[in-house]
Amino acid sequence: METQLSNGPTCNNTANGPTTVNNNCSSPVDSGNTEDSKTNLIVNYLPQNMTQEELKSLFGSIGEIESCKLVRDKITGQSLGYGFVNYIDPKDAEKAINTLNGLRLQTKTIKVSYARPSSASIRDANLYVSGLPKTMTQKELEQLFSQYGRIITSRILVDQVTGISRGVGFIRFDKRIEAEEAIKGLNGQKPPGATEPITVKFANNPSQKTNQAILSQLYQSPNRRYPGPLAQQAQRFRLDNLLNMAYGVKSRFSPMTIDGMTSLAGINIPGHPGTGWCIFVYNLAPDADESILWQMFGPFGAVTNVKVIRDFNTNKCKGFGFVTMTNYDEAAMAIASLNGYRLGDRVLQVSFKTNKTHKA
């Protein structure tokens, strides 16, 4: 007989992953007490489209990195939403936790903590879940599974065109034994809102080659975050108007901010794909550093690089810096939102980098 399930215990802030609440709803990774963990960090809840180079750039702004790894699904090659950063100096690792833990990047709030040494008990804890109600959210999926242990990452696959759930998801637990308990408790059961029982099994079971082939096909054409040339041209037309309005309102600022912005034609922005869109940020305070730029621009989209220009003698910020973003729409929205933004006692001037922009 099918059993109707109720949601398990809920966790605070589950939209971005479980936080320390109780034994069932705690941080994805325990803070390490061993000496070898004082430089090695685990970073949870990374944006799905964030690359290893972007992860390295973000944490490299804190201090010198010995190694950096974005963890990917062995079958699909897709990011699992977490990675590891190992610093050379333990002080930099501690600073990274204090500075970047809780940083909002796109729609995610990342969690940075000390990593534990790897062991067999925490490997192969990734579950494949099918038959989910199309209306089930990622938060509800986590609530359903959180009663069995600590969830590191979760994901629901959506149709690339409609954005509607495919009814398929993944849950990665902290330990394999927790994943085993979830299979025992939920496989063949009917969660709230479901008309059919769900299937819960290990995602990387070698005996399930057919399912692996299906998963690979699902990811052959990853969900493209960035539009093609024709779509991008149409979006530029819409955003040009937004930018013109933004710069018209803020015309009281330096002419450098407005020069060349009445139309985006003729702006000297790196043109070939992959280089990104370079943004000029002016009127930064002398004590400004790269982490400030990450915190400001991260919520708008994928940031590949940030750079604060410093005085060679004093190592203080010279008042300006640069941010590179991969997507035009996101870069333009960041400019429209942050130009004229008051940071401390300074009003920032933010624009696309032009020929007349200060050089590093």
UniProtKB/Swiss-Prot annotation:
Q: Return one GO MF term.
A: RNA binding
Q: Write down which residues bear the modification named Phosphoserine.
A: 221
Keywords (alphabetical) are: Phosphoprotein, Repeat, RNA-binding
Q: Provide the induction entry.
A: Up-regulated after memory training in radial arm maze experiments.
A GO CC term attached to the entry = ribonucleoprotein complex
| Signal peptide range in chain numbering | none
Region (Disordered), start-end ranges: 1-36
Known CDD domains for this protein? RRM1_HuB, RRM2_HuB, RRM3_HuB
Coiled-coil region(s)? none
- The UniProt record lists the RRM domain at 39-117, 125-205, 277-355
User: Which tissues carry this protein?
Assistant: Brain; neural-specific. Expressed in the hippocampus.
Question: Single Gene Ontology BP term?
Answer: cellular response to leukemia inhibitory factor
Which Gene3D superfamilies does the record associate with it? 3.30.70.330
Supply the InterPro entries for this chain: ELAD_HU_SF, HuB_RRM2, HuB_RRM3, Hud_Sxl_RNA, Nucleotide-bd_a/b_plait_sf, RBD_domain_sf, RRM_dom
- What role is this protein assigned? RNA-binding protein that binds to the 3' untranslated region (3'UTR) of target mRNAs. Seems to recognize a GAAA motif. Can bind to its own 3'UTR, the FOS 3'UTR and the ID 3'UTR.
Tell me which family the UniProt entry assigns to this protein.
Answer: Belongs to the RRM elav family.
Return the protein name: ELAV-like protein 2
Species of origin reads Mus musculus
